Amino acid sequence: MSYLNPEILARIMPLGLRAQRVVEGSISGLHRSPLHGVSVEFANYREYAPGDDLKRLDWRAYARSNKFHIKLYEEESDLRATLLLDASASMRYGRGAMTKFQYAATLTASLAAMLIRQRDAVGLAVFDEAEQSWLRPVATQAQLAKIIDILEKAQPDRKTDLSAVMGKIASQIKRRGMVVIISDLLTDLDGFYDGLSRLQHDGHEIVIFQILDPDEIELPFQDSVLFRDIEGGASAEQLFAEPWAFRKAYKAAMETFIGEVDTRCRLAGIDHLLLRTSDDLGLAMSHYLHSRQRGA
């Protein structure tokens, strides 16, 4: 399936995603930078766009391609965002139009397109119990094509170890920026909170999109159901049960789980947004981006 949805992009592109904390970068003034007078290093090219400084046109690149290109430097991105996408087996679940992974991948692609449109650098890490793919943040159109290619090839399959992945990602991100985590968060929460603390200690702004299927929240089944640990492999535990017998207790436990994550994030100054796969993604994202603008 295509993860770039024109209707979603039309809703969110005019809004944009702005950093609410001080980040490293200083070009267009959308984000404040704590760094002034730092040295810059050539990183890449992008095609010329109206309003760009003509002094920065690369004439050699024009001679090679017959297209106008602007030189990009490492310090030129207003925001460096790294998107962490959960591709563990639990993300395969879904009885509606999309699985959790398909919904999350659509969100990832939409965020990447929006960030690159506003000339910010975006990177991607796809993970399960380890890091499957890694792209360092770059602010070019070619980066979006790479991200889409990785999303289309990703296969949610193994267990989750979000805390270990967050530790590795923290060591790979060299400069302060934004880290966006897109996951169902069905993982060890203590390790997850430790990972959040490390990222915050390193100066990153964190945004969490928690993706759940409505079934996981409501447990709507009426008939007898065989429940199976989707990340347990061939030896997964199974339970044949009548959902009505424990629906109330299950929903209370799930409400406590979601509430705890939301409270911990709020106290730490971290944005946490719960998204159900039945939610209109474009509408939910536009509401969130509007709320960030009001709170910025």
Where are these regions (language model features)?
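Short, electropositive alpha-helical surface patch
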Residues: 135-149, 290-291
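Conserved phosphate-coordination/catalytic loops
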Residues: 102, 156-163, 186-187, 252-255
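Von Willebrand factor type A / integrin I
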Residues: 1-34, 40, 171-177, 189-296
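Helical mechanochemical/support elements of P-loop NTPase systems and associated helical scaffolds
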Residues: 55, 77, 143, 158, ...
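Von Willebrand factor
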Residues: 143-177, 189-190, 212-213, 217
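A short, mixed-charge helix-start or loop-turn motif at secondary-structure junctions
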Residues: 90-94, 151, 243
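Short, contiguous clusters of charged residues that form electrostatic/catalytic patches at enzyme active sites
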Residues: 106, 110, 160-167, 190, ...
